[in-house]
Amino acid sequence: ADDAARREQRLAIIKMAQSDRFRGVTRHLLKSFLSPDAMADEALVGRVIAMADAVGRENFVLQQHAILGRQDQSDTLRSLDVPVLVVGGSLDTLTPPERSEEIAALTPASQLLILEGVGHLSTLEAPQAVTDALNGFIAHIRHASG
């Protein structure tokens, strides 16, 4: 769940989106989603903007309201009885590494991977590293289950 400051930021973003400045919201948020190196990659920036455009203003606002209403899931994480891979970026400002560490610590059978120099959109910034981590995680589960 968001803290009070993050909640206020989210409400301001919703207001901006509702004022027909959806692309402006995307450009405004880009630095929250991407690392500085990724921000210099025009093709990647273009892909993220295209993804936001495809979501559309109405769906973006609905997503933000859903996030505002989410409850703390710490108890759910503690109760998980399955292997969990938590992947984060060292430069992720939306889910900072400390939060990824907290999530992993709450989950009994978790592995944590923090990708150095990567922001929030790790699958776009470091697709091979994420794929390798997932493949390794699945292989570990298969090996452990016999």
Residue ranges and their predicted role:
Residues 2-6, 20-79:
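Conserved alpha/beta-hydrolase catalytic His-Asp/Glu region
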Residues 4-8, 75, 98, 102, ...:
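Generic recognition of short, well-ordered alpha-helical segments
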Residues 17, 52, 92-95, 119-125:
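Glycosyltransferase donor-binding loop in the core domain
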Residues 29, 64, 103, 130, ...:
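Hydrophobic "lid"/C-terminal helical patch
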Residues 76, 83-85, 108-111:
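Structural signature of beta-strand start/N-cap positions in the alpha/beta core
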Residues 80, 86-88, 92:
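Short beta-strand/loop motif that positions the catalytic acidic residue
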Residues 82, 96-105:
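Short alpha-helix in the alpha/beta-hydrolase fold that links the catalytic acid
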Residues 108-146:
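Catalytic active-site module of serine/aspartate enzymes centered on a nucleophile-bearing elbow/loop
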